[in-house]
Amino acid sequence: APLEPVYPGDNATPEQMAQYAADLRRYINMLTRPRY
């Protein structure tokens, strides 16, 4: 199973937040993808 992305913290840069958001979206997609 994919690892859950780690929240970069309240002092994260916009780049870190964007990367986290992208990783989180990919992570959720992997969790919710139907398994055939």
From Swiss-Prot:
Gene Ontology CC annotation, any one: extracellular region
GO MF, one annotated term: hormone activity
Residues the record lists as Tyrosine amide modifications: Y36
Record InterPro entries: Pancreatic_hormone-like (IPR001955), Pancreatic_hormone-like_CS (IPR020392)
Compartments, as annotated in UniProt: Secreted
Gene3D superfamilies named in the record: 6.10.250.900
Keywords, alphabetical: Amidation, Hormone, Secreted
Function of the protein: Hormone secreted by pancreatic cells that acts as a regulator of pancreatic and gastrointestinal functions probably by signaling through the G protein-coupled receptor NPY4R2.
Family per record: Belongs to the NPY family.
Protein known as: Pancreatic polypeptide
Taxonomic path: Eukaryota, Metazoa, Chordata, Craniata, Vertebrata
Gene: PPY
